[in-house]
From Swiss-Prot:
This is LysM and putative peptidoglycan-binding domain-containing protein 1. CDD domains: LysM. It comes from Macaca fascicularis (Crab-eating macaque). Residues 98-107 have a biased composition (Acidic residues). Residues 1-20, 95-150, 172-196 are annotated as: Disordered. InterPro entries: LYSM1-4, LysM_dom, LysM_dom_sf. The gene is LYSMD1.
Length: 227
């Protein structure tokens, strides 16, 4: 007696009813997947390598090979452009649908200005009181803090240096003028006090070739040549 054919239960795992069975290792690109890739087109240059592109874009060499179906490092020069896979965050997948909810949550978390103002004023009063106790002076809100003097630009520094050099030159010239006007007469009286110095001043410097030592040496040489 033939047994009655069994009918598949509703919603079962049959071919027509229920979800479709998939084999091991099959890839499914689900719309709910938190990880998605966005591809950038990179124009290849003579010095480009897979390792350099991976470091530049923050991806692995295997991901670049998989996106462009490459097998070796030398095969990148067979193409003009390469696609670089870049991972996108899950927030970018919603296309701004949850942006309104996030904004509403931020508005609820943010305190109002009326609540923040008294706390800030109390904190400022405490800081000013502590500063006065320590002897420090805090500027008022309407009063601007003086700019530091030592912050000079390069041109200002060079101008200041030039002015200092000119002042030092003027001071040196004045000293030289004062020395020429008063000192020479006194020096002359001191140097010409001895008779020997007076003779030197009249006759001038005595050359070394006319000393007695040189005369005796010349006389000895003449006697040797005569012999």
């Amino acid at each position: 007696m033939a047994s009655p054919s069994r009918q598949p239960p509703p919603g079962g795992s049959g071919l027509l009813h229920g979800s479709r069975a998939r084999s091991y290792g099959s890839l499914v690109q689900s719309a709910c997947s938190p990880v998605r890739e966005r591809r950038l087109e990179h124009q290849l240059e003579p010095g480009d390598t897979l390792a350099g592109l991976a470091l530049k874009y923050g991806v692995t060499m295997e991901q670049i090979k998989r996106a462009n179906r490459l097998y070796t490092n030398d095969s990148i020069f067979l193409k003009k452009t390469l696609y670089i896979p870049i991972l996108t965050e899950p927030r970018d997948l919603f296309n701004g649908l949850d942006s309104e909810e996030e904004k509403d949550g931020e508005e609820e978390v943010r305190p109002s200005n009326d609540e923040v103002w008294p706390h800030s004023t109390e904190r400022k009063k405490q800081e000013t009181g502590a500063g006065r106790a320590n002897g420090e002076v805090f500027p008022t809100p309407g009063q601007e803090t003086p700019t530091p003097i030592h912050d000079l630009s390069a041109s200002d520094f060079l101008k200041k240096l030039d002015s200092q050099i000119s002042l030092s030159k003027k001071a040196a010239a004045q000293k030289l003028k004062k020395g020429e006007s008063g000192v020479p007469g006194e020096d002359a009286g001191l140097h010409l006090s001895s008779p020997r110095m007076q003779q030197r001043a009249v006759l001038g410097p005595v050359p070394l070739t006319r000393t007695s030592r040189t005369r005796t040496l010349r006389d000895q040489e003449d006697e040797i040549f005569k012999l």
